């Protein structure tokens, strides 16, 4: 008989709406002695069954629900079904955009809490961020090896959030032979170099794919400042779309080297591209003081808030950097600005940019609201899956 986790009165409502998390402060008692990662049944205070998930005793989220179907067992076939369903849901997108790099599993939003899997050509990269995901590692790898026999499988669970689960960071080859880095993926006819062993996250920001294409609409014959550029792919799309000049700015020399490589593998001349290894915050202030201006600016900063206590500081940071960027834009110019923090509500982010425009003494019009690419779905019961917010603003 499975271990049973009984909830406190009234704490069943979120699970009845199929939210997959059970917090420690919502648990009344535990019947049995579950091991970390063990499959447990969750019941309401009156005893009725709610879901089946993985036990994580050291986390504030003590159960992550695998299934809301009482008849569904958590075994190898369960993971195979989930992965096949996720792949089927992405097949149309892959054909439409010519993708060889995409997110295969988006954790809770694909019914596999704590599991992220990205496919980069013939390499699958896994992040296993929960105790349940970690315990099922060998099974997940076995299923992936069956379904994708030509792919190497590499783990990038080198993230601090595993500490909250009582897990150490880890990375390395799980199956097959890793090809020479970087691998080359394609999206929308653009080739992109990705190093899954050294790159950010799992190697690259697949979630910005649609927004890169959106940015290309505004750049023909324009001057473009691409801030926090990482491997320069907003600039790459801009070069392909005929931008007059591009400045890619990042603090990482390695990232900028990859940005140069991206231009070469696409056969693009980068005589009009400047690669600037610099602190974006300092550089924007310097350019403002020098009176330098641009037609298009992309702001894609790292996450400013990892927890709620950091949100106020993040708001100030977003306002400051957007204000300076707005001051650098020519009349009629375009700002594409992003927040990748799941804690930042979309409406609040828009208000911050609007307030930044007031401080910059610029009039702006919001012409697009942006989000993550559709291979990063948002489960209807899991609003936390909506993390990437973006705005396109015309500036006068």
Swiss-Prot record:
Keywords: Cytoplasm, Methyltransferase, RNA-binding, rRNA processing, S-adenosyl-L-methionine, Transferase. Signal peptide: none annotated. HAMAP family: 23SrRNA_methyltr_I. Belongs to the methyltransferase superfamily. RlmI family. PROSITE patterns: PUA. GO terms for cellular component: cytoplasm. This is Ribosomal RNA large subunit methyltransferase I. It is found in: Cytoplasm. It catalyses: cytidine(1962) in 23S rRNA + S-adenosyl-L-methionine = 5-methylcytidine(1962) in 23S rRNA + S-adenosyl-L-homocysteine + H(+). It comes from Shewanella sp. (strain ANA-3). The keyword S-adenosyl-L-methionine applies. Its EC number is 2.1.1.191. Specifically methylates the cytosine at position 1962 (m5C1962) of 23S rRNA.
């Amino acid at each position: 008989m499975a271990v049973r986790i009984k909830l406190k009165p009234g704490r069943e409502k979120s699970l009845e709406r199929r939210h997959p998390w059970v917090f420690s402060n919502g648990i009344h008692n535990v019947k049995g002695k579950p091991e970390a990662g063990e499959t447990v049944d969750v019941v309401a205070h009156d005893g009725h069954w709610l879901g089946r998930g993985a036990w994580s005793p050291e986390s504030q989220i003590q159960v992550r629900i695998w299934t809301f179907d009482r008849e569904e067992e958590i075994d190898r076939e369960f993971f195979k079904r989930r992965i096949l369903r996720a792949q089927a849901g992405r097949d149309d997108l892959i054909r439409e955009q010519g993708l060889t790099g995409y997110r295969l599993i988006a954790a809770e939003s694909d019914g596999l809490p704590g599991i992220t899997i990205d496919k980069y050509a013939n390499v699958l990269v896994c992040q296993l961020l929960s105790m349940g995901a970690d315990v099922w590692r060998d099974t997940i790898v076995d299923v992936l090896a069956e379904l994708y026999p030509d792919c190497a499988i590499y783990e990038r669970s080198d993230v601090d959030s595993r500490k909250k689960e009582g897990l150490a960071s880890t990375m390395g080859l799980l199956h097959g032979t890793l090809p020479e880095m970087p691998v080359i993926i394609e999206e929308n006819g653009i080739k992109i170099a990705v190093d899954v062993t050294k790159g950010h996250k799992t190697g690259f920001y697949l979630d910005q794919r649609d927004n890169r294409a959106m940015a290309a609409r505004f750049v023909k014959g324009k001057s473009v400042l691409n801030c926090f550029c990482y491997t320069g792919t907003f600039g790459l799309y801009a070069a392909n779309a005929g931008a007059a000049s591009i400045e890619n700015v990042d603090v990482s020399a390695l990232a900028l080297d990859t940005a140069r490589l991206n231009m070469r593998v696409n056969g693009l001349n980068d005589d009009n591209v400047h690669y600037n290894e610099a602190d974006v915050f300092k550089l924007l202030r310097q350019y403002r003081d020098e009176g330098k201006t641009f037609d298009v600016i992309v702001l894609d900063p790292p996450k400013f808030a990892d927890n709620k206590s950091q949100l106020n500081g993040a708001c100030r940071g977003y306002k400051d950097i957007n204000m300076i960027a707005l001051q650098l834009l020519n009349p009629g110019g375009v700002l594409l600005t992003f927040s990748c923090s799941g804690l930042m509500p979309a409406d609040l982010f828009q208000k911050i940019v609007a307030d930044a425009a007031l401080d910059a003494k610029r009039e702006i019009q919001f012409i697009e609201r942006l989000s993550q690419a559709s291979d990063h779905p948002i489960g209807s019961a899991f609003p936390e899956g909506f993390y990437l917010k973006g705005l396109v603003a015309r500036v006068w």
